[in-house]
């Protein structure tokens, strides 16, 4: 197919690494792509910004949607109960990465879950303020447990097995539901391509490995048509992988923000890869072993 003009429009020109953006530019302007091919380190950011200026123009949401209400984000730090701590330490020492990430949700009885307790409080607060809630998690088992915990407050959950048509039906039901109603969604499925402005509270059950995944999930509620301030709560547990994941992501996000606001891609990945998370688990193993006097 031939065309006189070619335009790419995306909210995520770069998600993991600078080469992704170079690949897009190569289609638009091969000459510019060849110039920036080697500019993949932070020291080259100024040159990169200047080189891509003819083909890359970034407009942030707040630049064009000045009427949007405030977005208020909060970290909800929870202290582990004894049973939570035992379950978490078992997951870490057995190098069960998924279970370690599901800290607080991986207990048998959610009455022992500090995150579940805080979630219930947030839902009650939302109802008292005439708000509705979206709860996101990466894990299907967490989705199942949250749905059981909240019972009749929930609509049907959204996950990868739900068809696009059925997803929209669930959202339509949620839009008509009273304050205090909760939509529970798997973040990969419900976090993109959906408009859920009837909710003004977003709860993230665990930190994700990519900031872009969380940002897109939040944007289901915080988008054109939203009339209320949107409250975002991140449920986190102290002295766990939650702390280390957040610390790592925040440092990467700061680098990205410093450059992306000037229409330049940060030359470092924002994503926590398997190797990085493996190092986080190793640090936790060492900490737990030291706690019990095991130096092996």
Question: Where do the PLM segments sit?
Answer:
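Conserved helicase ATPase core of P-loop NTP-dependent helicases/translocases
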Residues: 134-136, 145, 152-190
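SF2 helicase motor core recognition
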Residues: 16-18, 143-145, 182-206, 210-227
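Conserved catalytic network of the ASCE P-loop NTPase/AAA+ motor domain
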Residues: 1-4, 16, 70, 125-128, ...
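Interdomain linker/hinge connecting the two RecA-like lobes of the SF2 helicase core
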Residues: 34, 40-131, 140-141, 148, ...
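Conserved segment of the helicase C-terminal RecA-like domain
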Residues: 222-246
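Conserved P-loop NTPase motor "coupling/switch" region that bridges the ATPase
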Residues: 1-67, 179, 226-229
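Short beta-strand segments
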Residues: 52, 56, 77-79, 134-139, ...
